Amino acid sequence: MKVKSESEEGGGLERFGAYCKAVELFDLVVLDLSKHSSDFTLTRLIAQQYASADSIAANIEEGYGRGSRKEYTQFLVIARGSAQETMGRYQRFKHWLPEGIINLRTSLCREIIAILTATIKKLRDLEKAK
């Protein structure tokens, strides 16, 4: 059974708001942190931030590709956790990034989390109604 959810309305995954914002967030993480890549004390934190930001979009993609509503929902839960992780680490980057950047990025993370939360609820409600 192919998953039918808000992510498919009007044309598929690339029109799902959380996915588009997750891809945007990853690009911003790279932009924000690439200038700090020569600071060896930040190597691990930067790698973790790249990984958690990438994981948001990657888990949405994988869940979408699974084709079942139940699995898609589970991968959205994982993506939401990665968004939470990315947001928390941005807050801890306060020692190296300007406050304005941190506020913008954490706001974007909150938007992603809100969309994912609403979608998860909708998919779970549909699953219960079966």
List each model region and its residues.
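Amphipathic alpha-helical assembly/interaction segments
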Residues: 1-130
